[in-house]
Amino acid sequence: MGLTTFLQARRDAAELGEGVWRRAHDRFRRGLDRFHQILERLPEGEVLEQTIPLANELADLLPRVRAVAAAAQAAAPSSSTDVPASRDGRWSELHRALSKAGNAVAQCAEALAMMRCSGACASGCAKADAVSRRVAAVVEQVAAAEALLPGREQPQPAAPAVPAPADSAA
């Protein structure tokens, strides 16, 4: 282990702890690393050009995930595999959103690998669209996690539309 790796590990431990928030962040980072490893093996061409902006979009999410995990660690410290308890279930929901984001990044890497293995495709390739849809799911989960941070308003579920009672005039 080099000096920079050692210093990064200490910085991560101080900022993210050793519990569920650190694990959620690390899961996201590993999925992102895997996505970029697969991207590096794509042949030059249209598919690579379509995929690079998606890779950049995913990479831009890592600091946001780190900020969410650090804020969660500061507000509800975790040093084990147990999600901290809360009356309103906020920490469970936040952890669920971060976990879903990490899983969605892994699915992005999987979709990219499947696209790579299937070879070249015609313009308007549906396989590239699959990767794009998965990236959109990652963005959605990260935004959901950010919305659950303390100090941000909880999204209220929309009230169901109840039809007005009909006047029974006889």
Protein language model features and the residues they cover:
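Leu/Val/Ala/Ile-rich N-terminal alpha-helices, chiefly Sec-type signal peptides and the beginnings
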Residues: 1-55, 59
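Charged, amphipathic alpha-helical oligomerization/scaffolding segments
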Residues: 23, 27-34, 50-53, 57-60, ...
